[in-house]
């Protein structure tokens, strides 16, 4: 499952932000990295939910104050390297919590059509299918939510029910 770090940018773990006001969210792990190519800095937020479910999100630090920061495109044409960096951050989370399962949502941008799978989701899906084997994680997709779920098969007995429950939580949080 592991790849060389040369496939992504070096990253730094910054902080743990505890949540006490949310029914589902426990804490958020924050990482950062900087692109050697574009010199853009990125913030990665890994939200830890109940039952060891982690949502991986990232944005260009230049957009930190935008309410649409997760939807804005940086147009640096380095998606592959950024996604490998996300993959390595997921491995770091897995070292911290061996029971971790992951999910991410392909945020819509201005070129996406309502009701259709987002372009980001399609990119994430292709990347994950080619990078994460199904030995350790079972892959689930919810096209209607542009949601991709990786369920840790070693620690979750009923992976389909877990994925359905997680999709339900995501759906409630989105609306």
Question: Language-model features: where?
Answer:
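Non-catalytic substrate-recognition and accessory regions of acyl/acetyltransferase enzymes
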Residues: 1-175
